[in-house]
């Protein structure tokens, strides 16, 4: 089973408590502008707000867009997690479309297939400190770049 967080899912904006919006964007490295929260590429949006690793704390995915920054995929994403002390911390960022797999790394964090155009994608696994490339897959089967 595959949890796909793609552009079709982005159509529904998650309900994020106002008190957390600013801290989520700041943790993702965005700065506030007249048009909204900006990265170096474009105005971003919180596309996912849920407990992604089953620890009882919310996590968020902040996305921004632009082929000048992200090539043919046109999407960048930043995963931020609420810590036990209530603060938010960026865990990972990349260009591409994050596909959360059922396989897991440390602390219940799901492996991420970094999707986009092509036929062989890096799968990142959380090791307790960082998401690192664990393997390459296409449609659930091993592949090589």
Predicted regions and their residues:
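Hydrophobic h-region of N-terminal signal peptides that target proteins for export
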Residues: 2-9
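Terminal domain-start segments
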Residues: 9-50, 144-145
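Acidic, small-residue rich beta-repeat scaffolds with periodic aromatic anchors
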Residues: 11-23, 101-145
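Short consensus segments that form the blades of beta-propeller domains
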Residues: 37-39, 67-72
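Beta-propeller blade termini
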Residues: 43-52, 96-111
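Acidic/hydrophobic-patterned starts of short beta strands in beta-sheet-rich repeat architectures
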Residues: 54-65, 106-114
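Short, solvent-exposed loop/turn segments at conserved positions within beta-propeller repeat blades
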Residues: 70-75, 117
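Beta-propeller blade signature
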Residues: 78-82
